[in-house]
Every structure is written in C-alpha cells, then in structure tokens.
C-alpha cells in the first residue's frame, strides 16, 4: 500500500468522504458553508470571502440565473475566468440552478473558444473582462445570448 503523506496536513478533515451521505455536490457545500460560515473560504487580490459570503453571493447569482435569465436544469453555462474568487461563486450559483458549468480556458484562441461554445451548446457565458475581445471576434458564430462580466 502506498503511503499518503499529505493526509498529515488535513488536520481534523477526514481523509475519506462517504459519497452516499450527500445527494449532490451542492448539498455537501451547503453543509460546509453553514458549519464554517464565519471562516475564510477564498482570498483573492487582497479580499477575503467567508463561507457565508460565498453562500449569499452564489444564492443571489443562482436567483439571477433562474429568474432573470430563465436558466433551467441542464442548461450549459460557460465560465471563462482565471482562478479569481468569483469563480467558485459562479460555480456554486450555476450548480444551485441545476445548470452545467462548462469551464473555458481564458487563454483560448477565437477558433478554440468558438468550437467549445458550439460543442457544449452554451447560450450564456460568464467571462473575465480581459477575455472579452476573444469572445467579441466569434460571438456571432455561436448560440451565446447572454454575456455576464
């Protein structure tokens, strides 16, 4: 058996998770957000988001997706962003809405982006403003109807 030395750094966190305990990733994360509400969840560019912040912001994003945009279960939403704190908020909001997140490399060329958006059938994209020029080149060749920056 191979030694798993990294487990020493887990502290009180279990090394194994009973996957049958949760009905979804959202349920798992909602429990963590309640348990650790006041603790830092993410740090990015000098700002810290607590688990409570992530809970609140992702719930608001989910509501926006469902009520304002009409996103339904199974819809595919592209996310073209570096690893900023907005990324996990978008992920959880999309998951809470029952949609599917399609991760898009922010370094894609226009041809690569066009292919991925069309292949996945995305009509909505959450995009880092630094990547919008690439999207602007090909948006007319895709089904994208909504751009969220």
Predicted regions and their residues:
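Structural core segment of the AMP-binding/adenylate-forming
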Residues: 96, 100-149
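Surface-exposed charge patches
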Residues: 31, 63, 92, 115, ...
């Amino acid at each position: 058996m191979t030694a798993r030395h990294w487990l020493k750094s887990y502290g009180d966190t279990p090394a194994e998770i009973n996957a049958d305990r949760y009905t979804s990733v959202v349920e798992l994360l909602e429990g963590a957000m309640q348990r650790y509400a006041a603790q830092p969840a993410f740090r990015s560019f000098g700002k810290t988001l607590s688990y409570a912040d992530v809970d609140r912001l992702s719930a608001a994003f989910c509501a926006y997706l469902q009520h304002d945009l009409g996103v339904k279960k199974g819809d595919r939403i592209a996310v073209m962003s570096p690893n900023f704190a907005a990324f996990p908020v978008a992920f959880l909001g999309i998951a809470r809405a029952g949609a599917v997140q399609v991760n898009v490399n922010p370094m894609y060329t226009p041809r690569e982006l066009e292919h991925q958006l069309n292949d996945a059938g995305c009509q909505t994209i959450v995009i880092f403003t630094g990547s919008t020029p690439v999207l602007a080149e090909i948006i007319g060749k895709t089904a994208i109807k909504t751009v969220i920056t």
